[in-house]
Amino acid sequence: MGIFTFEDESTTTVAPARLYKALVKDADTIIPKAVEAIQSVEIVEGNGGPGTIKKLTLIEGGETKYVLHKIEAIDEANFGYNYSIVGGIGLPDTIEKISFETKLFEGANGGSIGKVTIKIETKGDAQPNEEEGKAAKARGDAFFKAIENYLIAHPEY
């Protein structure tokens, strides 16, 4: 098994507390409203804290698919949220687990800087596929942008 680590950073004009609330605390209701492809987010195991498994149901290419997302850690005081993809379409056959360590920081003019460390654990001697990595980054960037756009369009939230 190999472990490969990647880091990424995004910026937004949305304040960290507001963004964190949408991405973590109210994710089950905000994400389906903000991200067109995601139809629902539901808890399948747990109480919403670490260890909880959520099922994100989405439409991709006209088909209904899902991703299983396990909450690893929540640090509300420091705007931290760690989770893993543990099942569904988010895991290619060569990947055992994909973990995300995310944190929001104060950015310029009251905005936010979002930092994420992604750890990919492969099965056996498999290497991560560069195209899969690029596609995953593009999905992550589009997700972040969709939440940002929703919050900008809904200042009352």
UniProtKB/Swiss-Prot annotation:
GO terms for molecular function: abscisic acid binding; calcium ion binding; cytokinin binding; melatonin binding; protein phosphatase inhibitor activity; RNA nuclease activity; signaling receptor activity. Its main location: cytoplasm. Keywords: Allergen, Calcium, Cytoplasm, Hydrolase, Metal-binding, Nuclease, Pathogenesis-related protein, Plant defense. Trans-zeatin 3 binds at H69, Y81. The keyword rRNA processing does not apply. Trans-zeatin 1 binds at D8, Y83. Trans-zeatin 2 binds at E60. GO terms for cellular component: cytosol; nucleus. The keyword Cytoplasm applies. GO terms for biological process: abscisic acid-activated signaling pathway; defense response. CDD domains: Bet_v1-like. Its EC number is 3.1.27.-. It is found in: Cytoplasm, Cytosol. Gene3D superfamilies: 3.30.530.20. Ca(2+) binds at P32, V35, I38. Belongs to the BetVI family. Class II ribonuclease (RNase). Binds to cytokinins. Interacts with melatonin. This is Class 10 plant pathogenesis-related protein 2E. It comes from Lupinus luteus (European yellow lupine). The lineage of its organism: Eukaryota, Viridiplantae, Streptophyta, Embryophyta, Tracheophyta.
